[in-house]
Regions:
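Conserved ABC ATPase signature
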Residues: 147-152, 156
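The feature captures the beta-strand-to-loop junction immediately N-terminal to the Walker
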Residues: 37-39
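A short, proline-enriched helix->beta-strand linker immediately N-terminal to the Walker B motif
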Residues: 167-171
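Conserved ABC transporter NBD signature motif
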Residues: 60-72
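A short, surface-exposed alpha-helical micro-motif characterized by mixed small hydrophobic
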Residues: 215-217
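ABC ATPase "signature
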Residues: 233-234
């Protein structure tokens, strides 16, 4: 039985007619964590945005296929893509605080987000949110629910963003540089929480990062990008411990901030 939940097949992405992603292929199984690594500008974020229709008016997948289960995402109408985005593929951004509405409480935003995908009462939404907050070891769930984003720390906003992305229990989570704006202690907490999601729900995760330490702590497989091209792709142990390409070896020179011992 084919367990692939997401497949990129020879994908090329262009902006203004110029290709920036070249012939990239990878697949993701249920519960797998893929680390997408490379320097800034290598095309990491562009790759995941293509799957959820966030390339903007100038961006276009010009070759290849992106399949969720057996469905080619590129062939479906925008209305159907919106159903996949959030309900089937959740997203966490680098700065969750910036993506949250500053004039609505976290609780209000959770309720509105869930209403976009399912019929649910405010009470039911709060119950589900509080349950997930507790599973992710939030110390003061009620305070988070009642707070505006500006009343929370950057780290707490990021953790709330993870919870919001997961409340519909999407099978796939895209995490775009989720730890880069955080100090090391909060990085560890966020990594633990994403690993906890995999443990609780079998969530498959694509994490975009330039931090090799985060990749070592989380990933089962690793894809290294440079200038929109695949440099290496394989198991985390093989790519990180026995890199074949000089570019990968250069990336690994940085001392990792996190170790695999944070895996839950």
């Amino acid at each position: 039985m084919d367990r692939k939940i997401l497949t990129y097949d020879s994908v090329e992405i262009s902006f203004g007619g110029k290709a920036v992603i070249h012939d990239v292929s990878f697949s993701l199984e249920h519960g797998e964590i893929l680390g997408l690594v490379g320097e800034s500008g290598s095309g990491k974020s562009t790759l995941i945005k293509a799957a959820v229709g966030l390339l903007g008016s100038d961006g276009l997948v010009t070759r290849g296929d992106i399949r969720y289960m057996d469905q080619n995402i590129l062939d479906i109408p925008e209305k159907e893509k919106r159903k996949i985005r959030g309900a089937k593929i959740g997203m966490i951004f680098q700065d969750a605080g910036a993506s949250l509405c500053p004039i609505r409480t976290i609780g209000e935003q959770i309720y509105e987000s869930m209403c976009a995908h399912t019929k649910i009462t405010r009470s039911e939404a709060k119950t589900r949110a509080m349950d997930l907050f507790d599973k992710l070891n939030f110390k003061d769930s009620q305070r988070v629910w009642d707070s505006y984003p500006f009343e929370l720390s950057g780290g707490m906003n990021q953790r709330a963003g993870i919870a919001i992305a997961m409340l519909m229990n999407p099978p796939i989570l895209f995490a775009d540089e989720p730890t880069s704006a955080l100090d090391v202690s909060v990085q560890r907490q966020v990594v633990k929480e994403m690993l906890k999601l995999r443990e609780l729900f079998g969530t498959a995760i694509v994490i975009v990062t330039h931090d090799i330490g985060v990749v070592r702590a989380m990933a089962d497989t690793v894809l290294v990008l440079k200038n929109g091209k695949t440099i290496e792709y394989g198991t985390a142990d093989r790519v990180l411990d026995h890199p074949q390409d000089p570019y990968t070896r250069k990336l690994l020179e940085a001392v990792p901030k996190l170790q695999r011992k944070v895996r839950v």
